[in-house]
Design a protein with these regions (language model features):
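Feature recognizes metal-dependent phosphohydrolase scaffolds
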Residues: 1-286
Length: 286
């Protein structure tokens, strides 16, 4: 499958086809996923994609310009696939197709818009876009099941930690990352992974979003040391590219639905680990 075929299949997809994709991807994830933390091997390059929010045009641009189909590179999506953008249904179909066809190269993280029960978001127009395209409520119900199979975080050992929002402020072991979903809602680890934001403070404060926390540099330093990573890469904010905590944190957004610039990143995992300032210079803005 090449990109042109994928775009055509996505635009012409039917209810039966997307339900089939979901079923096939769930089977893949059942075999692949041992816990909430994906371990990515430090081979080849890794394409990093932030929030998409139904922005099919930006997703296609990234796949084309990163040359995903012409290489053995891996790609990680940091969550928030639907809502806000009118092509949310198509974005889901395309991502499911990528995972089905390239299971070992595609990593899908959970964002706050792929919420567990009790952490619902607003606005949430994904059900509308799915029903409009596929004339069915069943697709949305299956998509919600798919969310529960997504990774909460990913790690390239000794190099990079990936989450959608941020790192839990009271995290005491890597096992709590691995079991974030199982511990929810008794523990707030999953909520914070999906909702937290970095800021230039020392410790942490409750988030003005109403869920999660705002975390400071000391939290970042503690968690990166704990999981044996050097740079945190996350999304969750429509900033294009931003650096926090003296180069320890990189925020990347890959959607234009907010009217802002978008970006993606391609990291050579076989090279020396880069800090967020160095990664920001490598990012492709569009």
């Amino acid at each position: 499958m090449d990109l042109r075929e994928l775009i055509e299949a996505t635009k012409n997809s039917s209810k039966e086809q997307i339900l089939g994709r979901i079923e096939n991807v769930l089977k893949i994830l059942e075999k692949e996923k041992k816990d909430d933390l994906a371990i990515i091997q430090p081979k080849n390059s890794l394409i990093v994609v932030g929030d998409l929010h139904g922005d099919l045009e930006s997703l296609i641009f990234i796949l084309e310009n990163s040359n995903f189909f012409g290489t053995k590179d891996k790609i990680i999506f940091l969550g928030d696939y639907g809502d806000r953008g009118e092509y949310s249904a198509e974005v889901y179909y395309l991502l499911l197709t990528l995972k089905e066809n390239f299971p070992g190269r595609v990593f899908l993280l959970r964002g706050n818009h792929e919420f567990p029960k009790g952490l619902e978001v607003y606005p949430h127009d994904l059900p509308f876009w799915l029903a409009k395209k596929y004339k069915s409520e069943e697709v949305y119900e299956r998509i919600k099941e798919f969310w529960s199979y997504l990774y909460a975080s990913a790690l390239v050992e000794e190099k990079y930690l990936f989450v959608h929002g941020g790192i839990p402020v009271d995290l005491s072991s890597i096992e709590e990352l691995r079991n974030a979903s199982k511990l929810h809602p008794e523990k707030s680890f999953l909520e914070e992974i999906l909702w937290n934001d970095p800021d230039e403070i020392e410790n942490f404060l409750p988030s003005p979003r109403g869920a999660g926390n705002v975390f400071g540099k000391s939290v970042t330093e503690k968690v990166l040391k704990m999981v044996k990573a050097k740079t945190l890469i996350r999304s969750h904010e429509p900033v294009g590219i931003r650096v926090n905590h003296s180069g320890l944190v990189l925020t990347i957004s890959s959607t234009k639905v907010y009217g802002t610039c978008a970006a993606y990143l391609k990291i050579n995992l076989e090279e020396e680990t880069k800090n967020a300032f160095e990664l920001a210079k490598l990012a492709s803005r569009f």
